[in-house]
A protein has these predicted regions:
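Acidic/polar-rich alpha-helix caps and helix-coil junctions
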Residues: 1-189
């Protein structure tokens, strides 16, 4: 059974970048928003150009994050996510998928770019829920431990539940996160 604790499971190097900046609105997020808007307006040639810029900016941001983690923890290694690498990725992995479905590929690339320590994982989750509510299930998430359950809302942290009896009494064992929407999506809590 899964064990509660902070150091029980493997963690990506990107999540250990303790000195990497936390961004409220990053340049690559702005570009991804612009690319999505252009896709929705059927301006695909403009959207493609902006998506390429967004991916390049996202790669640079991830490179900064990884270099921070490498430095912070004294790990020997390097990270090359340069503009050339990003362009090669776009040309060889993204372009054909974008041509087939511009909006879907834009949203998938945005989701991938938000991984890491820059504070954008929550935005990726918001996009996931927004797209699902709009009937656009471009991003498929799965829970390998329970294929029918995926959180509909953000949970209380384990320290909040363990140290505050009021939270435990009000919310029980936390299973409501799989069945109840947040208040702005029709939930009651």
């Amino acid at each position: 059974a899964p064990a509660q604790g902070t150091m029980n499971y493997d963690t990506s190097l990107a999540c250990w970048a303790i000195t990497a900046p936390t961004q409220l609105l990053s340049y690559h997020e702005l570009l991804f928003i612009k690319a999505e808007a252009l896709c929705r307006l059927n301006k695909t040639s403009e959207a493609e150009s902006v998506l390429r810029e967004a991916i390049i900016a996202g790669f640079i941001n991830t490179e900064i994050t990884l270099k921070s983690a490498i430095y912070d923890w004294g790990i020997s290694g390097s990270a090359d996510l340069s503009e050339k690498v990003a362009n090669d990725y776009f040309d060889n992995s993204v372009k054909a998928l974008f041509d087939a479905n511009p909006l879907k590929e834009t949203m998938i690339q945005k989701y991938l770019a938000f991984f890491g320590a820059s504070g954008e994982s929550l935005e990726a989750y918001n996009d996931y829920r927004r797209l699902k509510a709009m009937g656009e299930s471009f991003i498929e998430l799965s829970n390998p431990n329970n294929k029918s359950k995926f959180p509909l809302r953000y949970t209380y942290g384990s320290s909040d539940v363990l140290s505050n009896q009021n939270v435990k009494e009000a919310f029980g064992d936390g299973q409501y996160v799989y069945s109840e929407n947040v208040w702005w999506a029709g939930g009651s809590r």
